[in-house]
Amino acid sequence: MSELNEKLATAWEGFTKGDWQNEVNVRDFIQKNYTPYEGDESFLAGATEATTTLWDKVMEGVKLENRTHAPVDFDTAVASTITSHDAGYINKQLEKIVGLQTEAPLKRALIPFGGIKMIEGSCKAYNRELDPMIKKIFTEYRKTHNQGVFDVYTPDILRCRKSGVLTGLPDAYGRGRIIGDYRRVALYGIDYLMKDKLAQFTSLQADLENGVNLEQTIRLREEIAEQHRALGQMKEMAAKYGYDISGPATNAQEAIQWTYFGYLAAVKSQNGAAMSFGRTSTFLDVYIERDLKAGKITEQEAQEMVDHLVMKLRMVRFLRTPEYDELFSGDPIWATESIGGMGLDGRTLVTKNSFRFLNTLYTMGPSPEPNMTILWSEKLPLNFKKFAAKVSIDTSSLQYENDDLMRPDFNNDDYAIACCVSPMIVGKQMQFFGARANLAKTMLYAINGGVDEKLKMQVGPKSEPIKGDVLNYDEVMERMDHFMDWLAKQYITALNIIHYMHDKYSYEASLMALHDRDVIRTMACGIAGLSVAADSLSAIKYAKVKPIRDEDGLAIDFEIEGEYPQFGNNDPRVDDLAVDLVERFMKKIQKLHTYRDAIPTQSVLTITSNVVYGKKTGNTPDGRRAGAPFGPGANPMHGRDQKGAVASLTSVAKLPFAYAKDGISYTFSIVPNALGKDDEVRKTNLAGLMDGYFHHEASIEGGQHLNVNVMNREMLLDAMENPEKYPQLTIRVSGYAVRFNSLTKEQQQDVITRTFTQSM
């Protein structure tokens, strides 16, 4: 114990004392020790020769992936765990931060605990043979999450999956949406964290012996035992790279490396849809500042270490199927890093390291990963606002989320974004990811008595279809409300099953080891097709919509007479309908019982599944044709927001965060000239636009999320025809960024047909 205390004292030398020394409390450490920065980017250094050499090597593999739409390589015989692979390098002599998921760059691992079927599907898609022993083990001896879920699913849920009224459920792959507090590895070292977990384990003994909440207590004891074991395995993994992480980091290089080792353990053992990195830049700046002041490193060396960390995050890959890629296209893993924001005490959390992270988009060029997310506040330093705006204009690689909305909601300044738009407090909260429900199809079920318009089979509860020649708004709304009740029940039932089985068969021990003992859980539901449903209701209410029926009386098309207000133009007649749908569905979800008493939340988010949803949904009363993509996330339907940027932003900002606390995704594309004639004016105008969209006060809620693309449609058309000219072209789509060349032609076309705002 004295040896551990000596390690702690040495590592913490020069830091301001606080509660963080007596308990696991990273926020307190940051608040006591960080240096806010309000200056500009002039201090930044460029790429070193080592960085350029390493990144050129990585880009060879990335270009191959772009060209083939297939993995560079993947395992077929080794089930991945924290310790399953030997050390891997790009070029060991040049790397300042080390660690790969497997023994080779961009080689993907087998992670079978979520489900063997996805692995079999991937092997088949890419003409590789899965080792028969892997299949035998995970079919006959070791049950998977996927098998557990399908053992318990109801016939109703299976029909909902087949029809696409529920899509993307994490029932065949890792759920993700959990952020380990990877900073804890650097600040405390593994031995301290293992000691803390042992104390947590012991704290449950009295409840266990007295039969208090017996099942929950036994489960938590087992989970903590697994967490403790995972921490030990992290030490073993790091030792393969020549590092002893039993004690805390003693300098900036170790702080970055230790933090990354915590994350590497997560992505070696889990293939979650979103494996977010957290909120590390300000934490790491404390170590960098200490070393800079002591003359131990230069600014060039600081940037190089950040570059090599970010390079590793860019290289994380999971083995997926083409069907998965349709929903989440372009290999996203959502290594989301939340940057900036303001502290509860009024100081900015922007540091020089916030700039260094953004600078990687210049030292190594644009990239979709890590999913860099600016926590925007009107009170952010002006220099940082303008630099972030410049980075968006130059790279289209950033997303923005409203710190002035979320910080007071949590009463906490140490939250981060999981996945795309979903906030949670780091190390204290986790999400049960729930994909999304299709509101546009739900409306068609209301009109057709629960019969699916594409499959021509009964999916929803059997009821009389609407019979009249003209759709009546009140009748449609009454029936839709009934079908939303049904859908909410199917949805929550499915998610309860999924997350019970994931905890049982694919528990995220390494991630949860970097959480407190008792965490807050949210049941993160979602809706898709919001603008389609709102516009359809608007058409029914304000125009005349006549259903066209087939020989079986099924409404398969709609004829619209007259004009109707469309979402995205700051028209309260339709905007209020969208607001009502969000609030209405959330209230229905909130009435239902959730697994582990998770707090129900909801997102308005689609990822790239707006294309898949469109394929699965027939003609809708707004005039959208069968198969046409939905507007992504909370976006208006393509081309319908005709009154400029401010009107479109205003419509989306009306959607209530109080009923969508899992996030509201809005993707905004604007041509450069619409922002101004020169770079300085464009930076100022883009920053001003975000100040306006995110402006938040008690009486007027600000928008929650904004993807920003600044580019011309002509460039995207050229990139479709000449992909080799644009190997790193990055664009923002619903909730994340993606290399344009990694999208399918269909998805590229969808992006190109979206609204490119020509005026403010």
Curated annotation (Swiss-Prot):
Coiled coil: none
Alphabetical UniProt keywords: Acetylation, Acyltransferase, Carbohydrate metabolism, Cytoplasm, Glucose metabolism, Organic radical, Transferase
Enzyme class: transferase
Pathway(s) it belongs to: Fermentation; pyruvate fermentation; formate from pyruvate: step 1/1
One BP term from GO: glucose metabolic process
Domain of life: Bacteria
Modified residue annotations for N6-succinyllysine: K63, K107, K117, K124, K195, K454, K467, K654
Modified residues (Glycine radical): G735
InterPro entries in the record: Auton_GlycylRad_Cofactor, Form_AcTrfase, Form_AcTrfase_GR_CS, Gly_radical, PFL_dom
Family statement drawn from the similarity comment of this UniProt entry: Belongs to the glycyl radical enzyme (GRE) family. PFL subfamily.
Protein name: Formate acetyltransferase 1
Organism of this sequence: Escherichia coli (strain K12)
High-level lineage: Bacteria, Pseudomonadati, Pseudomonadota, Gammaproteobacteria, Enterobacterales
Encoding gene, per UniProt annotation: pflB
